[in-house]
Design a protein with these regions (language model features):
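A short, flexible beta-alpha/helix-coil linker loop
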Residues: 1, 34-38, 134-137
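Short, solvent-exposed loop/turn segments at secondary-structure boundaries
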Residues: 4-7, 41-45, 140-143
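A Rossmann-like FAD-binding core segment of flavoenzymes
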Residues: 16-113, 165-166
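FAD-site-proximal beta/loop scaffold in flavoenzymes
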Residues: 82-152, 156
Length: 229
């Protein structure tokens, strides 16, 4: 499954590719989504900025679109709307991994049951679950940046358990990632402390937007892969 911003990034990148190839004026790019607004779970600030960028690129957004049938080059929604297409890029709904769903780790919804603050399984204290395997059930975004910080945190907890002393940092429920729209980019940031505590929605804002943000992402990507091994 892709990161939640991926459908909007793909739409922007497809639009940019069509523009580069000189066929943008012969093409229509649209986003149909189950949510009423882009990244609705991140609040109106992020959602509004994504809508603004899509609109500037001539990309229409259609919310509340729940597909129920695919036939003859058309997608039909539950409310009767139809989408005709030449190229369809479809994102499946998030679902628990079958291996986990059929294991003793799974809860009633199929996702593992874990302590929301430590990601430790209450039934199997030596087992931790992070990333896409559990985050949808915790109302955390199934995004690489969240899994990255969860991994660092859990590694510290395991080391602490082995050494018998606290040597790690508390989990930092803050995430940011650059959304790449092809010729523009957006850097949102969200704090998920209220989500993990079960007291409310995440607190999100826009840190930066512009072409230079995309250049920053490209530089970081090169650095990441160059230092990965």
């Amino acid at each position: 499954y892709p990161c939640p911003p991926a459908p909007y990034e793909v739409a922007g990148q497809v639009e940019f590719a069509l523009k580069v190839k000189g066929v943008r004026d012969k093409s229509t790019v649209e986003v149909f989504h189950l949510n009423p607004a882009p990244l609705a779970g991140m609040g109106p600030v992020i959602s509004g900025k994504v809508l603004e960028i899509l609109k500037s690129k001539g990309i229409a957004f259609h919310g509340g679109f729940e597909p129920v049938e695919f036939a003859g080059g058309k997608v039909k929604a539950k409310d009767g709307r139809e989408l005709s297409y030449d190229l369809l890029i479809l994102t499946p709904p998030f679902a628990p991994n079958r291996v986990v769903r059929e294991s003793p780790l799974a809860g009633p919804q199929g996702f593992p049951e874990v302590d929301r603050m430590t990601f430790r399984s209450p039934r199997f204290p030596n087992v931790f679950v992070i990333g896409d395997t559990v985050n949808p059930a915790l109302m955390l975004p199934p995004a690489g940046v969240v899994a990255h910080f969860q991994g660092e945190y859990v590694a510290g907890v395991i080391a602490s358990d082995l050494k018998g002393a606290y040597i790690g940092e508390p989990f930092n429920p803050v995430a940011m990632c650059i959304m790449d729209f092809g010729d523009n980019a957006l850097l949102p940031q969200c704090a998920f402390d209220r989500v993990l505590a079960g007291t409310g929605m995440p607190s999100c804002g826009v840190m930066a937007v512009g072409k230079w943000v995309r250049v920053t992402k490209m530089l970081f990507e090169g650095f990441w892969f160059a230092t990965l091994i």
